[in-house]
Regions:
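Substrate-binding cleft/loops of secretory-pathway carbohydrate-active enzymes
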Residues: 267-277
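Divalent metal-binding segments
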Residues: 3-7, 12, 16-268, 288, ...
Length: 363
């Protein structure tokens, strides 16, 4: 077994009694010594298989932790169309055309990271995307991951038409005549579109995406991550990676609780999270809590506000208090952390009230 001595560096320890050190010794995947060079040399004296790395004054930091990620989605997105730098609608269309030309055999085109600001007040709609690509479905995740912008072919593939009802907690964008515009908000995006796209992904696809995310993290010095929206297929991919020795990082996850409109079904999801938490109590993966999307975001005017937005819209919360309270109470009673997304003032009040009542009930 090789023991490695790293010496001659500036090592940040995060220990208030010894914030900096010169050397560290690693053996069997664990640090056996952190301190001064001279003491490290003495600690390593007589070690049969010793490898020495001269740091030459380099700074060494503990591994970083990404406190909010979606691992499998992150890995998959590395191969998708990135629209973050699009300057305006025309530039976005040009990038989409170029991506389509680069992927002539792809049955559908997936991208993301687009922002509302470059559209200069123009509402995103299917026609703008159709002008660039009309022969294949196009799915573009917004930068905040709360909306998906699709073209006409994607609406048809999803089976969404003017008569399709809004899902619980979401909205299908419609024009003044009631026609679907190609914008899917909140659970219409995360449910209708994401669930469809997820159904097309194989276990091998998920494994490759996870491997890509882990490789990108390790290259950047990230050794731990908190996945804020874990689902069953993604958890299975994580467990496969851990079993095969491919995971490479430690993961704490929050199980996504999706609104169903059925109190029993909502609570059943908490039970599922608890079962996974108990099953994965030890090891590199654990279910730390639940994730609940109480409302949307400001950019797409889906945050639950007490006053209307400038366009006159005033959407309600994804989770009203009477539905949210029993879920939060049950998760807290099960020993699960409760992570809630709440941006609007109405949603924030709902989230805080649910927490207060859970504390009152559970102590």
């Amino acid at each position: 077994m090789t023991t490695t001595l790293y010496r001659g560096g500036r090592i940040f320890t995060a220990d208030p009694d010894q914030p900096w050190a010169e050397a560290l010794v690693e053996s069997a995947g664990a640090l056996t010594f952190v301190g001064a060079d001279a003491a490290a040399n003495e600690h390593s004296r007589g070690v049969a298989d010793l490898r020495i790395v001269e740091l030459d004054g380099a700074v060494v930091l503990p591994g970083f932790v990404d406190a909010h990620t979606h691992l499998v989605h992150l890995g998959a997105s590395l191969g998708h169309l990135d629209l973050l730098g699009a300057r305006d609608a025309a530039d976005l269309q040009d990038r989409l055309r170029a991506y389509a030309a680069q992927h002539p055999d792809a049955p559908r085109l997936i991208g993301g990271q687009w922002l509302f600001e470059p559209l200069a007040g123009r509402a995103p709609d299917r026609h703008l995307l159709d002008e660039a690509v009309a022969d294949r479905p196009v799915y573009l995740h917004s930068n905040d991951m709360h909306s998906i912008w699709v073209n006409t072919a994607a609406l048809a593939e999803l089976g969404i038409d003017d008569a399709t009802p809004d899902p619980v907690g979401g909205t299908i964008g419609r024009d003044a005549a009631g026609a679907a515009t190609g914008m899917l908000y909140e659970t219409a995006a995360l449910g209708l579109a994401e669930d469809f796209l997820a159904s097309l992904v194989t276990d091998a696809d998920r494994d490759r995406a996870l491997d890509a995310a882990v490789a990108a993290y390790l290259e950047a010095g990230v050794t731990g991550a908190v996945d804020m929206g874990m689902r069953g297929d993604d958890l299975a991919a994580l467990e496969r990676a851990a079993a095969d020795g491919r995971l490479g990082i430690r993961v704490a996850a929050h199980w996504l609780i999706a609104p169903t409109g059925d109190p029993a079904a909502d609570l059943a999801q908490v039970g599922e999270a608890r079962a996974h938490a108990e099953r994965l109590a030890d090891g590199p993966i654990r279910i730390a809590g639940v994730k609940i999307m109480v409302d949307g975001v400001i950019d797409s005017c889906t945050a639950a506000m007490r006053a209307p937005f400038a366009d006159g819209s005033r959407p309600g919360p994804i989770w009203p208090l009477d539905a949210l309270e029993p879920v939060v109470r049950a998760a807290d009673a099960a020993g699960l952390q409760v992570a809630m997304h709440a941006i609007g003032d109405e949603a924030s009040d709902i989230a805080l009230t649910a927490l207060e009542r859970a504390i009152a009930a559970n102590g």
